[in-house]
From Swiss-Prot:
Pfam families: His_biosynth. It catalyses: 5-[(5-phospho-1-deoxy-D-ribulos-1-ylimino)methylamino]-1-(5-phospho-beta-D-ribosyl)imidazole-4-carboxamide + L-glutamine = D-erythro-1-(imidazol-4-yl)glycerol 3-phosphate + 5-amino-1-(5-phospho-beta-D-ribosyl)imidazole-4-carboxamide + L-glutamate + H(+). Coiled coil: none annotated. CDD domains: HisF. This is Imidazole glycerol phosphate synthase subunit HisF. The gene is hisF. It comes from Xanthomonas euvesicatoria pv. vesicatoria (strain 85-10).
Length: 258
């Protein structure tokens, strides 16, 4: 496996970075570009930006901040939010994003994954999956999680959707474990291991990081390709240079950074 990736996640609403707990109660965390520059300087491997209101509000992402970020950072970044067709994806990539991520629009029209893969190559197409464990013990997907008033519970099992997304051309999967989001108690290793067993493309863990050991655990125990986190990076609780030194000390290969 290639070096593991450390990926700050920036949820965007009204031109600002916000963060919630379990996709609820978002608070302002700062300016998009300022945070992007901070993470670039600290040695982040890439960035993910989620315009969390775009899909629930039926609009596309705001290209102006995508262009601002692209002008100022030289690490890869992925943009998600309201990308429901090839032309919108093309505009986001033209604005400077390296990858686009789709979530709710793909649940409504799965063929979108194939259309994007055919147009831009699988390396550009990330499928984000918001997953929650239900009372019967099954993990199932949620839609429109950026707006609590519009969130939809779907009958589709998470594992089935992972398999289908791959078949259609997803080049990477980001698994957002909603039960763990923002609570800082560790990644959902059990769920990630099940997804890893059937996921042939790069798998990124999201939701639950609270301390450096949580990153080591998810790499060692779930064999994910990257770990995404937000609140511990935004708050400064885990500086990325220290995290990379910690992981190297545990014989986990990470990319060079500070």
């Amino acid at each position: 496996m290639l070096s593991r990736r450390i990926i700050p996640c920036l949820d965007v609403r009204d031109g600002r970075v916000v963060k919630g707990v379990k996709f609820r109660d978002h608070i302002d965390m700062g300016d998009i570009v300022e945070l992007a520059l901070r993470y670039r300087a600290q040695g982040a491997d890439e960035l993910v930006f989620y315009d969390i209101g775009a899909s629930p509000e039926g609009r596309s992402v705001d290209y102006t901040w995508v262009e601002r970020v692209a002008r100022l950072i030289d690490i890869p970044f992925c943009v998600a939010g309201g990308i429901g067709d090839v032309e919108t994806a093309r505009a986001v990539l033209h604005a400077g994003a390296d990858k686009i991520s789709i979530n709710s629009p793909a649940l409504g029209r799965p063929q979108l994954i194939s259309e994007l893969a055919d147009a831009f190559g699988v390396q550009c197409v990330v499928v984000g999956i918001d997953s929650i464990r239900e009372e019967d013990g099954q993990w199932r997907v949620r839609r429109y999680t950026g707006d609590p008033s519009k969130t939809q519970a779907l009958p589709m099992r998470t594992l089935d959707w992972v398999a289908e997304a791959q078949r259609l051309g997803a080049g990477e999967i980001v698994l957002n474990c909603m039960d763990n989001d923002g609570v800082r108690r560790g990644y959902d290793i059990a769920q990630l291991r099940q997804v890893r067993a059937l996921c042939r493309v790069p798998l990124i863990a999201s939701g639950g990081a609270g301390e450096m050991q949580h990153f080591a655990d998810v790499f060692d125990q779930a064999d994910v390709d990257g770990a995404l986190a937000a609140s511990v990076f935004h708050s400064g609780a885990i500086p990325i240079p220290e995290l990379k030194r910690f992981l190297r000390a545990q014989q986990i290969e990470v990319r060079d950074g500070q």
